[in-house]
């Protein structure tokens, strides 16, 4: 038991705090005058280096080809499935026979903003009657909602 290592008895040279190297304090410190930056040139100047410069090698963004296209006026639609609504009804977050619109979906966290457009899709199964106020709806979703006795009202 006497040979056990204790935290208060451990001592190594590494545990001492290493003092920082003095830079730019005359030739006696070893890193004086130019402070390890060499003479003149772009890298000797103050400020940051060039973004994407790889020492003359062709940079990564010029090596890789351009791909794709991002339209400026892209229609961003939040998708809600009929099965998701059924799960919310079963979890008693939405009442049966209620009106489902942007405000309710925003409160439940289905859409990020009330300004987002909503599209109703027919994934899953709906057993309860509901009235939907959405921007878009697939034909299959409309058919499944109306077959139960609900309705889909297109806003836009």
From Swiss-Prot:
Gene3D superfamilies: 3.100.10.10. Residues 25-49 are annotated as: Disordered. Pfam families: Ribosomal_L27A (PF00828). Keywords: Ribonucleoprotein, Ribosomal protein, RNA-binding, rRNA-binding. The keyword DNA-binding does not apply. GO terms for molecular function: rRNA binding; structural constituent of ribosome. One of its GO terms (biological process) is translation. GO terms for cellular component: cytosolic large ribosomal subunit. Residues 34-43 have a biased composition (Basic residues). InterPro entries: Ribosomal_uL15, Ribosomal_uL15/eL18, Ribosomal_uL15/eL18_sf, Ribosomal_uL15_bac-type. HAMAP family: Ribosomal_uL15. Part of the 50S ribosomal subunit. This is Large ribosomal subunit protein uL15. The lineage of its organism: Bacteria, Pseudomonadati, Pseudomonadota, Alphaproteobacteria, Rickettsiales.
């Amino acid at each position: 038991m006497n040979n056990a290592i204790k935290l208060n008895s451990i001592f190594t040279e590494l545990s001492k705090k290493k003092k920082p190297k003095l830079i730019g304090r005359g030739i006696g410190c070893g890193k004086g005058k130019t402070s390890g930056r060499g003479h003149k040139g772009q890298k000797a100047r103050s400020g940051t280096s060039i973004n994407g410069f790889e020492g003359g090698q062709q940079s990564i963004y010029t090596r890789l080809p351009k791909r794709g296209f991002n339209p400026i006026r892209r229609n961003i639609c939040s998708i809600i499935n009929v099965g998701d609504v059924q799960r919310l009804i079963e979890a008693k977050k939405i009442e049966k026979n209620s009106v489902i619109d942007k405000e309710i979906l925003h409160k439940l966290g289905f859409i990020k903003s009330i300004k987002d457009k909503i599209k109703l899709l027919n994934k899953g199964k709906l057993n309860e009657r509901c009235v939907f106020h959405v921007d878009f709806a697939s034909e299959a979703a409309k058919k499944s909602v109306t077959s139960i006795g609900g309705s889909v009202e297109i806003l836009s």
